[in-house]
C-alpha cells in the first residue's frame, strides 16, 4: 500500500510538472515591438541574386495589404495591433485585430493534409519546448512578402517559418525565422514583443480599398 502511494505521488508530480511547464500565453496582448517593428537591420539581410532581383523590382503597390488582403505569414508576424491567444485542447488560436485574422496552431500532433493548398496563413503546427511554444508554418503562398520594405518571399514548397514564443512576466516574446533559400542565404530573423493587457479589447478592423492605397 505504501509503495502504491509513492508511485501515485510520483505520477502526479511527473505529469503535474509537465503540464505547468507549458507557457501560459492566454489573454490579450498589446504590441510593444522593438525599433523597425522587430525587423533586422538591412545590413544583416543576406539575399541571393534571385532575392535581390525581387527586392529591387518591388513597388509599394505589391504590398498585399494595399489590396485589402490580410498580411498572413511571414509578413503578418509583427504588426502594431493587439492579439488574443486562446487555448483549446487540440489547438491554440491566435486572434489578430489586424484584418480579423484567425490563426490555428494545431498542437495535437497532426500534420498538414495532402490536399492543403498554399495560402497566406499557411498551415501551422506547434509543440512545447519546456515553456516555449515552437510553431512551424508550411504551405505558404507566394502572394506575400517577408516585410513591407520589399523583402521577398518565394512561397516555394521548401520555404517555411519557425516561431518561438515565450513569456517573461507580463511580456510575450517572439523570435521568428523565415527559411526561404530561394531569396535568402540564411534565415531572415524577426523579433516581436507584446505586453499583457488584462483589460484589453480587440476592436473591429475594416480595410477600405480607396483608403488603403488601391486606385
Set out the residue ranges of the language-model regions.
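Bacterial N-terminal signal peptides that target proteins for export
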Residues: 1-8
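Short amphipathic alpha-helical "recognition" segments used for binding
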Residues: 8-9, 167
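Hydrophobic small-molecule pocket/channel-lining residues, especially in calycin-type beta-barrels
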Residues: 2, 20-215
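Short, linear, compositionally biased motifs with a strong N-terminal bias
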Residues: 12-13
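N-terminal signal peptide c-region/cleavage motif recognized by signal peptidases
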Residues: 16-18
